[in-house]
Amino acid sequence: MKDIDTLISNNALWSKMLVEEDPGFFETLTHAQNPRFLWIGCSDSRVPAERLTGLEPGELFVHRNVANLVIHTDLNCLSVVQYAVDVLEVEHIIICGHYGCGGVQAAIENKEQGLIDNWLLHIRDIWFKHSSLLGEMPQERRIDTLCELNVMEQVYNLGHSTIMRSAWK
């Protein structure tokens, strides 16, 4: 793992490279952002939204949490959604899950891990809802299928939020 000095050095090199390519880059970026997309994704460090989509700073509004959940009581996520919809007027919302999600796997394993257990209950609910389908599968396929079902459930949650219902009126 890189130390903080390496991160700071990398950031300085990144900034320098951008200014060399486009001297007004940061000045332009400070005036406004105009993303067309809101990305709700997993906190997993292997799923970097901008890098996966090839978008630059200002082009993608991002919210990340463990297992890309959209929960009706999560004021952080809902605030991001409302800001994206009402202020930034994004055109599309992407809920991006991924195979091999550690949050989904932890929910299946049902080991005590502390505070995160409360968060994982939402995935366990999906597990129980689809247990007859999932129970017959090999472990790896079970996790991947639960990752897919989780994304579908979060799309449902988002679509039934007051924010989206108001936006669609």
Name each model-derived stretch.
Residues 58, 91-93:
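Generic beta-strand structural signal
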Residues 40-42, 64, 94-98:
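Short beta-strand segments
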Residues 1-35, 67-91, 102-169:
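Divalent-metal-activated hydrolytic enzyme cores
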Residues 57-68:
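Glycine/charged-rich beta-loop-alpha catalytic/anionic-binding loops adjacent to active sites
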Residues 18-59:
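N-terminal short beta-loop-beta anion/metal-coordinating cradle
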